[in-house]
């Protein structure tokens, strides 16, 4: 999907040196990944160890002509046929553009968060659903402040379902990721010790993660995890909650028994009132839980996913 540079400048609130007519379809944050220079928009990101502005001259020589920068350096003045979109924060500009892109699509989107298992659950869901949906999903573990907008930018008119993961390491980060993913269905895998040092408490971290689901139609979680259940209630999200359970026979997905063999596990369950037997090639507790999270999406799919 292509965007005019003039539209992008408006969306990200950029000042400009000039606005030559041009369109782009690719976002670039790493100069080493350049493939189609004429259609690339380079974001000069600043990190603790690097500064993307250093690579603009090199990229210009390689025929890139569109840049988002926070500093207008003297050497850029000679690049008369290039567009420079000047913003205060280039990462924030990237996130704003990805949010705008997400708004162009009215398809179901599954958002996954939690301390562990996000990528595995995403890939398991892809295997379960890819025959029914044209799926766009996060590459690898692209779940950061940078990875999420790059993932969502992949959305196109051909897609009928999105599956994206979101990770945070400190407070207030999910507030930025939520409108980029804008999930219609949420999954929270678990709450562990990852990045705990940056939060005042596990409760604060869980509540921060649940921010992803503010506008969801359904939230899937382990109903036997009372800590997550209490956080969901505190966040006033209980009316959206769809819990799977090992103890509540009235749950949409009730796990009756888990029978571990040497090389496989047999799960006996009741799914929407129907008895099912599921055999999986895993025996470790983490993989079994990840599979059950994915199984819990199936009853949700009947009402919240549309072909």
Can you describe what each PLM-predicted range is?
Residues 1-96, 283:
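N-terminal leader/targeting and accessory segments in enzymes
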Residues 9, 92-223, 227-240, 299:
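Phosphate-binding loop of NTP-binding sites
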Residues 11-12, 74-78, 187-305:
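Acidic, Mg2+-coordinating active-site environments of NTP-dependent enzymes
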Residues 28-29, 44, 69, 86-87, ...:
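Structural signal for conserved beta-strand scaffold positions within catalytic alpha/beta enzyme cores
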Residues 43-46, 137-139, 164-165, 280-281, ...:
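Thr-Gly-centered strand-to-loop micro-motif
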Residues 47-50, 88, 115, 142, ...:
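Short, surface-exposed acidic/glycine-rich loop or hinge patches that mediate macromolecular interfaces
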Residues 50-53, 145-146, 171, 288:
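Loop/helix-junction capping segments adjacent to catalytic residues or to phosphate/diphosphate-binding pockets
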């Amino acid at each position: 999907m292509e965007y005019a540079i003039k539209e992008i400048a408006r969306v990200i609130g950029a000042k400009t040196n000039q606005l030559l007519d041009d369109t782009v379809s690719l976002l670039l944050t790493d100069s080493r990944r350049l493939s189609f220079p004429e259609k690339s928009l380079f974001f000069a990101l600043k990190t603790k160890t690097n500064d993307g502005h250093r690579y603009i001259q090199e990229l210009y020589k390689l025929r890139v002509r569109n840049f988002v920068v926070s500093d207008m350096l003297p050497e850029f003045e000679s690049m008369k046929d290039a567009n420079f979109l000047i913003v205060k924060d280039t990462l924030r500009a990237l996130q704003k553009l990805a949010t705008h892109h997400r708004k162009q699509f009215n398809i179901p989107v599954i958002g996954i968060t939690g301390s562990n298992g996000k990528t595995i659950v995403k890939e398991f869901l892809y295997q379960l659903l890819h025959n029914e949906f044209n799926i766009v999903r996060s590459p690898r573990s692209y779940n950061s402040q940078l990875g999420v907008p790059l993932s969502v930018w992949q959305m196109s008119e051909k897609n009928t379902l999105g599956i994206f993961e979101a990770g945070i390491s400190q407070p207030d980060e999910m507030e930025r990721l939520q409108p980029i993913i804008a999930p219609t269905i949420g999954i929270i895998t678990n709450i562990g010790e990852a990045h705990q040092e940056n939060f005042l408490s596990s409760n604060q971290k869980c509540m921060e993660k649940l921010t992803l689901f503010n506008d969801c139609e359904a939230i899937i979680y382990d109903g036997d995890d009372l800590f997550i259940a209490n956080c969901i209630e505190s966040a006033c999200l209980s009316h959206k909650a769809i819990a799977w359970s090992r103890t509540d026979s009235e749950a949409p997905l009730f796990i009756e028994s888990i029978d571990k063999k040497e090389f496989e596990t047999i799960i006996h369950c009741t799914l929407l009132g129907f008895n099912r037997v599921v055999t999986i090639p895993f025996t470790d507790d983490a993989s079994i839980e990840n599979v059950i999270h994915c199984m819990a999406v199936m009853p949700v799919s009947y009402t919240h996913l549309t072909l």
